[in-house]
């Protein structure tokens, strides 16, 4: 299932505190993504992070609610696409009518059932998502970065009239929301995958370990080689202690922007003394020092920020899904390049066709990304024709 109001840190603080820690108690954790133009992608990223850390393989989304009868198949695909990219593999459609009787049936979108004239063709949409979901369930995620989730920093800013309903009024909270969205979009545009780390999870499931001769920070089932601290004004002392241990054993910590000014809601400069790389937020990606395994550039050689990616490793194979999250902008002749070499197969979730797209010591090819286009690839060491 899902909880009420997830779209922002303010909404979570107002209604439930922190959405991520609730997922521990759900067999199939989920979200509710309302409207056609909801671009709060981070709510699904929070769910994906918790699911990875908790070892939960199924992620639910109640989707398509509060859209409209103009909602066509392209819209069904586009709204579902980015959610599938970030792990949604159980689609709970809003909605299907039992009957058309009653005033309560004035709902949106049109019934995804026999009452709609287009319903006999809806399998085209669902077959597409079935293939995409199975594709994204293979292997394990390629994700080395943990981003501390700053929701508890907002808890310290609650006072009369700090917000109006679910909209922040407090200027510091508004800035925290802006930085939160900016961090998400900056990392995704840079083709750098990450998980959020809830401080309650870090306290109860966090540890510092050595893996293959390298220091890692573990949260439950997931391990991370780098930790990013940004957009936080408060940090738990337990989090600070684990980060100190991680740094002392050779772990990599990056603090982008101002470090937390409070520890357990008490003014402190301890976070500013962490052994870490300190940088301005605009230099965050460079300071991370993570070499992306894939890039997608336009004709001028600029990285196309609208194309997001998820990478997974399945034995010797590298699995990649690239997705143009822009519904209006096409990117023709984009240069796609991977650091990996071998044989690059395209798996088409629309038609189920598989064909060889490129090969070489370093996979590189041109591709036309239509608005809302997806590209599913498998890079193998051997030609599997």
Predicted features along the sequence, with ranges:
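Carbohydrate-binding surfaces of carbohydrate-active enzymes
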Residues: 1-385
């Amino acid at each position: 299932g899902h909880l009420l109001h997830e779209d922002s840190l303010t909404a979570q603080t107002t209604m439930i505190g922190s959405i991520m820690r609730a997922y521990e108690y759900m067999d199939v954790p989920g979200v509710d993504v309302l409207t056609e133009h909801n671009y709060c992608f981070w709510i699904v990223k929070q769910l994906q992070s918790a699911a990875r850390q908790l070892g939960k393989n199924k992620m639910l989304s109640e989707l398509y609610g509060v859209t409209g009868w103009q909602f066509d198949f392209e819209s069904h695909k586009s709204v579902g696409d980015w959610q599938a990219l970030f792990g949604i593999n159980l689609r709970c459609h809003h909605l299907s009518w039992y009957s058309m009787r009653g005033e309560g049936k004035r709902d949106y979108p049109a019934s995804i059932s026999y009452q709609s004239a287009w319903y006999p063709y809806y399998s085209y949409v669902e077959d597409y998502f079935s293939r995409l979901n199975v594709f994204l369930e293979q292997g394990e995620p390629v994700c080395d970065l943990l981003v501390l989730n700053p929701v508890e920093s907002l808890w310290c800013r609650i006072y009369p009239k700090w917000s109006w309903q679910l909209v922040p009024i407090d200027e510091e909270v508004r800035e925290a929301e802006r930085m939160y969205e900016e961090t998400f979009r900056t990392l995704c545009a840079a083709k750098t995958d990450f998980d959020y780390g809830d401080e309650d999870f870090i306290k109860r499931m966090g540890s510092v370990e050595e893996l293959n001769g390298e220091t890692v920070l573990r949260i439950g089932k997931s391990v991370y080689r780098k930790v990013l601290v940004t957009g936080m004004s408060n940090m738990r002392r337990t989090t600070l202690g684990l980060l100190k241990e991680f740094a002392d054993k050779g772990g990599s910590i990056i603090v982008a922007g101002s470090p937390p000014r409070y520890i357990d809601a008490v003014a402190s400069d301890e976070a500013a003394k962490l052994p870490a790389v300190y940088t301005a937020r605009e230099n965050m990606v460079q300071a991370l020092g993570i070499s992306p395994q894939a890039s997608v550039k336009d004709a001028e050689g600029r990285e196309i920020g609208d194309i997001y990616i998820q990478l997974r490793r399945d034995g010797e194979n590298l699995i990649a899904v690239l997705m143009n999250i822009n519904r209006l902008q096409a990117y023709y002749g984009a240069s796609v390049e991977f650091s990996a070499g071998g044989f690059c197969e395209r798996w088409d979730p629309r038609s189920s066709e598989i064909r060889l797209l490129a090969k070489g010591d370093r996979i590189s090819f041109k591709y036309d990304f239509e608005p809302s286009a997806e590209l599913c690839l498998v890079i193998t060491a051997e030609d599997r024709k």
